[in-house]
Amino acid sequence: MRNVELETVLNNQLNIGAFQDYAPNGLQVEGRRDIQRVVTGVTASQALLDAAVAHQADAILVHHGYFWKNEPVVVRGMKRNRLKTLLTHDINLYGYHLPLDAHPELGNNAQLAKLLEIQVLGEIESLLPYGEFTTPLNAVALRERLEKQLGRSVLHCGDRAPAEVRRIAWCTGGGQGYIQQAAEFGVDAFITGEVSEQTIHIAREMKVNFYAAGHHATERYGIKALGEWLAEQYQLDVTFIDIPNPA
């Protein structure tokens, strides 16, 4: 497949025109024209780039790419090294941020719901879905399910919250700012990747279970699902490479 064809396929599948994002979605760094071997990962870190070079990839597809708003525009240091790796090895870099969070089947939020066996009911607002467990789950058991499925420890604040969780909202990655909207909507619990100092106070005062399960850990599954879809639909050789990150 040509690199520009792959961009069109991904742009259409993820409906990128519906989003105002913090970084460009699509082909961010152009490499060789023809693509057969693709590496997917959460973030276009140097470690992922090096793994893609070792894998002889034609393209890298990530959730966290480059050229974020307000980042320095000069090419030096870390940015130079990353771009040099891509350009020296003629590797294409594709990045999809909010469109990959939001996709109703392949997105990070959809995939986390699938992993946790949550029945999705709708959205409180854009990027903030809610749903229910068929059978209410003890709040501690939910933390244990998260830890088992994600393979990491999970912070749980349930000081004044319901002991059982039926209705739940979630936002993968750095979605802790949505906790108040979720609590006001009337959920028993809210899951995201990160925690801020004020998040715990809000959880306590609004009597909602809060879980911080890791930015990286909660966002592994969208990019993995997108790569699997590409492999199935277009017969590309796609490999997901997980670069461990405790954050």
From Swiss-Prot:
It holds the Pfam family DUF34_NIF3. Keywords: Metal-binding. One of its GO terms (cellular component) is cytoplasm. Disulfide bonds: none annotated. GO terms for molecular function: metal ion binding. A divalent metal cation 2 binds at residues 64, 215, 219. SUPFAM superfamilies: NIF3 (NGG1p interacting factor 3)-like. A divalent metal cation 1 binds at residues 63, 101, 219. Belongs to the GTP cyclohydrolase I type 2/NIF3 family. Homohexamer. This is GTP cyclohydrolase 1 type 2 homolog. It comes from Yersinia pestis. The lineage of its organism: Bacteria, Pseudomonadati, Pseudomonadota, Gammaproteobacteria, Enterobacterales.
